[in-house]
C-alpha cells in the first residue's frame, strides 16, 4: 500500500509519525493532509535507509538539490561527494539527473548513500540509452520509457519527474503563441521531439494508468513536470504554460483516485509581480497538490549569481504557498555545478525557505531566529555560530575578521551600539 492508501484507510504509518515528530505537528494532522493529497511523503518501499520528509500544507518548506553526472563529467565519486555536501548543508531531498557514464550505477550509489528522498527524471536515462540502442531519442519504442521507470522504481527512487502534461494540444498552444525560448526543459524537449517525429501522443499521457500502476507498486510519488515552463521572464505565464498546468490538474485527480501520491512542478523564470499569481493558479487548478518550484529565477541577467535570483523568487513563492524549492546554483546557465556550487545553492535555497516559513507562521522557524537574537544579546559567539545556517562560514569570519579572545567585533569595537545603549539604560553591558 502507498502512504495515500494507508491514510485513506485511517492508518498512521511510521513514516507519518516521523514526519509529525520532525515538524512538531500531530500525527492526526499528517494523516488528514496525506489523505487529502495536500501533503506527500516520498518514500519508496525499497529505499531502505530513508529518513522520510513530508512536503505540503502546514509543513516547513523543503529544499531539493540536483546532482548527477554529465557526458563531460561522468565520475560517480564526485556526485557522491556532492550528495554528502548537499545533505550536510540541509537539503531535504536530492535528484539524480545523471546523463553521463553509467547512469544506472550512479542512481544506485546515490540511493544507497542517501538518507533523504531521491528523485529522478526517467526520461533522461531513456534518452541516453535510446541513442546507444536505437540510434536516436526519437527512435525509442513507447515500451522503453515504462521499462526504465519500472527499473528506477524497483531500485528505490522516491519520486520521479514525468512530463505527462505535454500533449498534442499543449504543443499547439506552444506553436500558436510564439516564445523567445521555446522549451528549456530537457525532459520536455526529449518528449516533444519524440512526439513530433512519431506524430503520436505523449505515451506518459496516453498510458497514464500504466504509469500509475508502477508508482503504486513501489509507492513512488509522481512529480508532474512542467515541460513548457518559461525559460526567460518574457515567456512567463503564457498560454502554453497554463495549458500544461490545466492538464496536470486533471492528472492529479486521476493519481489520487488510484491511491498514488502526486505533486506538481512549476517555473522557472518568473518576474516578481507574477510569482504569487503562478502559485495561486497552481493551487487552484491542481487541487492544492504540493507545489515544487525551480527557483523561480526573478531576473535573467545574473549568471554566476542565480542562486541569489532563485532565492529571491523562492522566498516569495514559498510565502505565497509553494511547498518545495529546487535549488539553483551559481553555475546555473553556465555549466555543471561543482561541490562548492552545490553547497552555496542549498544554503541560498534554505535561507529562502526559512524566511518564508517565518512569514507563514511555522513555529520552529521563528524559534530559531529568537534563539539567535538572544545569543547576540548575550554576546554568545559560540551559540551564534551553532545557530547559523552555515556554521562553518560564520566561524571562519569570526576567527579571521577579529582579534583572538576579544568580545567585540571588528565592525564596531568601542562604538558598539548595544554597549552604548546598555550604559544609558543601566542594563548589563554587552558588545556585539
Curated annotation (Swiss-Prot):
Catalytic activities: 5-amino-1-(5-phospho-beta-D-ribosyl)imidazole + S-adenosyl-L-methionine = 4-amino-2-methyl-5-(phosphooxymethyl)pyrimidine + CO + 5'-deoxyadenosine + formate + L-methionine + 3 H(+)
Note accompanying the cofactor annotation: Binds 1 [4Fe-4S] cluster per subunit. The cluster is coordinated with 3 cysteines and an exchangeable S-adenosyl-L-methionine.
InterPro entries: ThiC, ThiC/Bza_core_dom, ThiC/BzaA/B
Positions contributing to substrate binding: 66, 95, 124, 163, 185-187, 226-229, 265, 292
Binding site for Zn(2+): 269, 333
EC number(s) from the headed UniProt entry: 4.1.99.17
Required cofactor(s): [4Fe-4S] cluster
Gene3D superfamilies: 6.10.250.620, Radical SAM ThiC family, central domain
Positions with a binding annotation for [4Fe-4S] cluster: 409, 412, 416
Gene Ontology BP term (one): thiamine biosynthetic process
Pfam families, A to Z: ThiC_Rad_SAM
UniProt KW 4Fe-4S keyword: yes
Disulfide cross-links: none
Record's keyword terms, sorted: 4Fe-4S, Iron, Iron-sulfur, Lyase, Metal-binding, S-adenosyl-L-methionine, Thiamine biosynthesis, Zinc
Cited function: Catalyzes the synthesis of the hydroxymethylpyrimidine phosphate (HMP-P) moiety of thiamine from aminoimidazole ribotide (AIR) in a radical S-adenosyl-L-methionine (SAM)-dependent reaction.
Membership in a protein family: Belongs to the ThiC family.
The protein's name in its UniProt record: Phosphomethylpyrimidine synthase
